[in-house]
C-alpha cells in the first residue's frame, strides 16, 4: 500500500550533489512529508566511478556519505520494493517542491530554482563526520584549521582537469595564484590548506609559485573521501573555490563570516554574506 505522504528522492554524485538532494529532502520534511532516499546509484554506477581513464591515479568509488557527516540526523533509505512502486510517480520538474506525494524525484532539474542556504544553516551544527571519533589525525587537523588564520584552497582535477560539458574549462594556475595574492593582501600570517584530488599537480604547479607562504597540501583524504575535504574547507576562515562545487558546498556549511572566493556563478550566492567572485578566462592551450 502506498504512503500518501512519502517522497522518495533518487540520489547520485559526489558529496556536494548528495548535500543538495539531502537538503531537498529536508525541505519536504518541513512540509510535513516523510522522505526516503534511493541510493541504488551508489551500488551500481558509483562503483569504480573515479578511474584512471578519468584522470585519477587509481580506481575509487563514489559512496553514499551523508550519514557519515550527519550521523545524528534521521535518514531513511527506500527499499527496492518502495522504489519500484513509486517510480510511476517520477518527476524531474524544476518546480518539484510544489508537487505533492506520492512522489519520486529524479535528475538535476530540481536545482534550477532550489535555494538550500537556509536549510544548510540549520543542519550545519550537526556536521560532525564520524571519522573525528576514530582518527586523531583528522581531529587534530580540524582543530589546527580552526585555531589558525586559515585559507582553504580546493583544486578540482581528475575528471574535471579537461573541459567538461557541465563545468566548462578547468580553473587554471593563474586563477589560484591571483586568489592567493588577494588573500595575502587582505590578511597577514595566513596559512594555506590545499585540498585536491591530485596532490602531485598541486605540488608541481602551485606550491613552487608561492614560496615563503606557509602552506599544507593535505594528504588525509582520497577522492573516495571527499566529505573530509568538505569538512576541513568549511572550518577555514577563507575558502577559495574552483570550477567544481566543493568550495560552494563548504561555504553552505560554514559560518556566516567565512569569506568565499569563487570563479563560478550560482544564484544562491545572493542569499549569502562574504562572497567574492573572481572573473577569469582560462587560457587556451
Regions found by a protein language model. Name each.
Residues 11-20:
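A short, glycine/small-residue-rich beta-strand->loop->alpha-helix junction that serves as a flexible
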Residues 5, 46-187, 285:
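Secretory-pathway luminal glycosyltransferase catalytic domains
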Residues 15, 185-278:
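Donor-binding and catalytic core of enzymes assembling or modifying cell-surface/extracellular glycoconjugates
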Residues 34-45:
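A short beta-strand-loop structural module common to alpha/beta enzyme folds
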Residues 20, 46-50, 164, 202-206, ...:
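A short acidic (Asp/Glu
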Residues 2-8:
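Extreme N-terminal starter segment of soluble prokaryotic enzymes
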Residues 8, 36, 152, 191-193:
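A structural signal for isolated positions on well-ordered beta-strands in alpha/beta enzyme cores
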Residues 20-28:
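Short amphipathic alpha-helix
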Amino acid at each position: 500500500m502506498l504512503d500518501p505522504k512519502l517522497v522518495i528522492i533518487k540520489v547520485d554524485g559526489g558529496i556536494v550533489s548528495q548535500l543538495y538532494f539531502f537538503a531537498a529532502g529536508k525541505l519536504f520534511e518541513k512540509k510535513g512529508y516523510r522522505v526516503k532516499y534511493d541510493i541504488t546509484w551508489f551500488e551500481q554506477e558509483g562503483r569504480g566511478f573515479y578511474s584512471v581513464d578519468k584522470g585519477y591515479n587509481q580506481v575509487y568509488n563514489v559512496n553514499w556519505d551523508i550519514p557519515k557527516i550527519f550521523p545524528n540526523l534521521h535518514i531513511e533509505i527506500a527499499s527496492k520494493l518502495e522504489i519500484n512502486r513509486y517510480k510511476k510517480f517520477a518527476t524531474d520538474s524544476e518546480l518539484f517542491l510544489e508537487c505533492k506525494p506520492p512522489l519520486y524525484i529524479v535528475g538535476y532539474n530540481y536545482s534550477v530554482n532550489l535555494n538550500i542556504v537556509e536549510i544548510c544553516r540549520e543542519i550545519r551544527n550537526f556536521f560532525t563526520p564520524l571519522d573525528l571519533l576514530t582518527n586523531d589525525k583528522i581531529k587534530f587537523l580540524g582543530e589546527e584549521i580552526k585555531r589558525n588564520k586559515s585559507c582553504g584552497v580546493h583544486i578540482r582535477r581528475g575528471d574535471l582537469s579537461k573541459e567538461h560539458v557541465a563545468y566548462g574549462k578547468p580553473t587554471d594556475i593563474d586563477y589560484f595564484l591571483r586568489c592567493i595574492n588577494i588573500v595575502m593582501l587582505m590578511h597577514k600570517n595566513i596559512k594555506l590548506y590545499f585540498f585536491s584530488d591530485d596532490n602531485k599537480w598541486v605540488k608541481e604547479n602551485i606550491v613552487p609559485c608561492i614560496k615563503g607562504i606557509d602552506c599544507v597540501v593535505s594528504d588525509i583524504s582520497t577522492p573516495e573521501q571527499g566529505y573530509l575535504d568538505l569538512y576541513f574547507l568549511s572550518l577555514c576562515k577563507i575558502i577559495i573555490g574552483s570550477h567544481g562545487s566543493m568550495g560552494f558546498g563548504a561555504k553552505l556549511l560554514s559560518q556566516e563570516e567565512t569569506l568565499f572566493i569563487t570563479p563560478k556563478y550560482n544564484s544562491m550566492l545572493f542569499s549569502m554574506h562574504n562572497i567574492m567572485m573572481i572573473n577569469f578566462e582560462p587560457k587556451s592551450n
